[in-house]
Amino acid sequence: MFLVVKDLNKAYGTKENKINVLKDINFSLEKGSLCTLLGPSGSGKSTLLNAIGGLEKIDSGSIVINEFEISNLKQKDLSNFRRKYLGFIFQFYNLIPDLTVIENIQVGSFIHNNPMDIEKLIKDLGLWEHRNKYPRQLSGGQQQRCAIGRALIKKPEILLCDEPTSALDYKTSKDILSLLQKINKKYETTIIIATHNEEITKMANIIIRLKDGIIYKNIENVEVIDAQELEW
């Protein structure tokens, strides 16, 4: 398996006010999977996504990516691993306002010895005619495409997306999700999306439902599931 999460636990607060955010989380993904972490606010999905990305330190358990146990890495090694293997897309685009589209995307290539062909990538993103524009000149969907390009330019093994369409309208959201599907198929990038949106599960081949910090349901072959399996 490409990604293995085993017996993962995470809590916040002191002993007296301890809140268990993730409890005994276990699952695995093969390379090229498109997985949704589905759950309401407070279910632990964003914390789990951040733990996989090395942004949250876990209390116990292990996270293994491509045979690297990232939960045991020192901070410097973890930072290097994150830069080399992982890409991040967030709800807010975090583009550099004084850089153009092409310059914002190039920022992601500076830390990789063999970045993706930027012209080809920008065309795949549908941004070629906007490549010399600044973020303030772009729509929300175009800004998110630019953020996706910045994450992809370094050829990440895993793309971690935290509510990537929550700030977008319905049509733009569908366009972004369609783009992520194309990226998954074309580049065989493993994609994990944390979301509360049931619609996004339609694009995934693995659905992991979280509720109160535990995996409530893990559906591994979405194409053959019964509709009732998507219910809580």
Language-model segment annotations:
Residues Y134-Q144:
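Conserved ABC ATPase signature
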Residues I148:
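Hydrophobic anchor residue at the start of the ABC signature
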Residues G61-E69:
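Conserved ABC transporter NBD signature motif
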Residues L159-D162:
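Catalytic Walker B motif of ABC-type/P-loop ATPase nucleotide-binding domains
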Residues G53:
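Helix-to-loop junction immediately C-terminal to a conserved catalytic motif
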Residues I153-E157:
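A short, proline-enriched helix->beta-strand linker immediately N-terminal to the Walker B motif
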Residues I70-G87, V224-E229:
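ABC ATPase NBD coupling module
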